[in-house]
Amino acid sequence: MSVAGLKKQFHKATQKVSEKVGGAEGTKLDDDFKEMERKVDVTSRAVMEIMTKTIEYLQPNPASRAKLSMINTMSKIRGQEKGPGYPQAEALLAEAMLKFGRELGDDCNFGPALGEVGEAMRELSEVKDSLDMEVKQNFIDPLQNLHDKDLREIQHHLKKLEGRRLDFDYKKKRQGKIPDEELRQALEKFDESKEIAESSMFNLLEMDIEQVSQLSALVQAQLEYHKQAVQILQQVTVRLEERIRQASSQPRREYQPKPRMSLEFATGDGTQPNGGLSHTGTPKPAGVQMDQPCCRALYDFEPENEGELGFKEGDIITLTNQIDENWYEGMLHGQSGFFPINYVEILVALPH
């Protein structure tokens, strides 16, 4: 920075201190300007918070959002294509239903019904993915562009205006000690910056119908999603009702117990007829077979942040994901969340 530039910065700082500490009066901007500045500030804050809340609405699981963001960042660093999308809850439910529907098979009512509903859930997850992309393209991205371009440019003009106001007020206070031409130039620069800032704010506020169009795109995307979701659910409802009707019309089978086998005791000479026991009964199961990843809580854990899963010592928690070296994601009593690894012991490990 040149000597003249350093000198000007010193003058601005001096004027700012005299206003804040000494109570000096600076040049006041008119009420219309202040009102536009207020509305622009509210617009800027609204855009940032609404973008954040919209993403949370579309992708409600904070752990999944964090993992997805990390994967996409690493893919970008490595020059790879964009990583997988957000794991929709409907897709996870569909996967479980389809899996157990296949295991149960077609010789019962529940298995095929699980398959039908699982397929409907898979279709819902695809429609949800389309909603995510539509909202990002037609709502979030335009708001991001508004924030990064127009609002940032206005903030630049306002900052420049404030600097020139301080410079003008400093020189005005020293009128008679500095050349009149220098004061006149400072006033011209201040007026020029005020006009540029005022014009940019006016144009933004005057064209706010663009933001209304973006809101309309958000609502229309949701409307289309719900229309398709209703259609999918209506179709699977018809199939389930038909399955119920057919099952109700079939004669109910009666349980037919198999003949019991007799227990034969040893004879007096210590031998057992026919080689011993002819009936061993039903073997007692050795214990509960845990066929899915799970862990046991070693201590109580009270959640302190949104998205964390609380539990009590001894609770058995179903594991769904490992976020990083310190956190697991799991489910307990129908609630999903993440929790510290060192609070639990693994019973069935997650697949690698």
UniProtKB/Swiss-Prot annotation:
Q: Which residues form the signal peptide?
A: none
UniProt membrane topology term: Peripheral membrane protein
What does the entry's free-text domain comment contain? An N-terminal amphipathic helix, the BAR domain and a second amphipathic helix inserted into helix 1 of the BAR domain (N-BAR domain) induce membrane curvature and bind curved membranes. The BAR domain dimer forms a rigid crescent shaped bundle of helices with the pair of second amphipathic helices protruding towards the membrane-binding surface.
Q: Where is this region: Membrane-binding amphipathic helix?
A: 1-21
Q: Which domain of life is it from?
A: Eukaryota
* Record's protein name: Endophilin-A1
Which Gene3D superfamilies does its entry note?
A: Arfaptin homology (AH) domain/BAR domain, SH3 Domains
Q: Per its database record, what is this protein's job?
A: Implicated in synaptic vesicle endocytosis. May recruit other proteins to membranes with high curvature. Required for BDNF-dependent dendrite outgrowth. Cooperates with SH3GL2 to mediate BDNF-NTRK2 early endocytic trafficking and signaling from early endosomes.
Taxonomy, top ranks, is: Eukaryota, Metazoa, Chordata, Craniata, Vertebrata
